[in-house]
Design a protein with these regions (language model features):
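Hydrophobic/aromatic-rich alpha-helical bundle segments in the mid-to-C-terminal region
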Residues: 127, 149-199, 211-215
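Amphipathic alpha-helical linker/stalk segments
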Residues: 65-95, 103, 107, 146-150
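Key DNA-contact positions within bacterial/archaeal DNA-binding proteins
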Residues: 51
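C-terminal alpha-helix
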Residues: 144, 198-210
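Helical hydrophobic small-molecule/effector-binding pocket
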Residues: 69, 90-125, 170-176, 205, ...
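Residues at secondary-structure transition points
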Residues: 8-12, 16, 58, 66, ...
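Amphipathic alpha-helical packing segments from all-alpha helical-bundle domains
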Residues: 90, 101-102, 106, 110, ...
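Basic, helix-initiating cap at the start of DNA-binding domains
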Residues: 1-48, 56, 61-62
Length: 215
């Protein structure tokens, strides 16, 4: 969770304090944006000293990366634990639904909007956001697809490419655009369930079981 788990001088850092800093920073990034969020403001919000922040994170960029990764890691375990049992459809539906609901959450959309609006640091922030969030989720999806392929449930010869395509089905949902002007509709459970069911059905149709593919 923290960047400097052993601290700058080899001493273990306080993990609970590090989490407090990350939580405060994430809220400020969402509220104020990257440029307006300073380490002084983070220290004030977290009720810690600025020195305490530097004991955990080398820079504001490192803190931003940790905040994005922490947010992602909070929902990812639940997303994939829900998909342990059941058919391929049930497992993928659990993952896809959790992913889309997370993408639709106000704070995630706010961070994305903040990154896109930050012309000064957009490139570097986009890289940090990708590494802390999407890249991690895609890796988890890849692992699930490898298992489904190994068990001959689905035919997934290229798990990396298929994981990226699966994630794109939800990242590319029109509900993310609709959320900008009609959030009630975009966040409606029936709308989300309908979209996810169709997306998963299409993905499974493109990755038929090995036995079917060789028949």
């Amino acid at each position: 969770m923290t960047q400097n788990s052993q601290g700058r001088r080899g001493r273990p850092t306080n993990e609970a304090l590090g989490q407090t800093i990350v939580d405060a920073a994430y809220k400020l990034f969402v509220e104020l944006g990257f440029q307006a969020t300073t380490l002084d403001k983070v220290a004030q919000r977290a009720k810690v000293s600025k020195l305490s922040i530097y004991r955990h994170f080398e820079s504001k960029e490192a803190l931003f990366s940790a905040a994005i990764a922490d947010r992602c890691h909070q929902f990812a375990p639940q997303m994939f634990s829900e998909s342990i049992d059941g058919s391929a459809e049930v497992q993928l539906l659990a993952v896809g639904s959790s992913l889309l609901r997370t993408l639709l959450s106000p704070d995630v959309r706010s961070v994305e909007a903040m990154v896109m609006a930050d012309k000064k640091s957009q490139k570097s922030l986009s890289k940090l956001q990708y590494e802390g969030g999407p890249a991690y989720v895609i890796a988890q999806i890849e692992a699930l697809l490898r298992q489904l392929h190994k068990n001959e449930v689905l035919d997934v010869p290229d798990p990396v490419a298929s994981a990226r395509l699966f994630a794109a089905l939800f990242k590319g949902s029109d509900l993310l655009i609709i959320a900008r002007f009609d959030p009630a509709r975009a966040e409606d459970s029936k709308e989300i369930d309908s979209y996810c069911t169709s997306a998963v059905a299409m993905f499974i149709a493109a990755h038929g079981a090995k036995s079917e593919a060789t028949a």
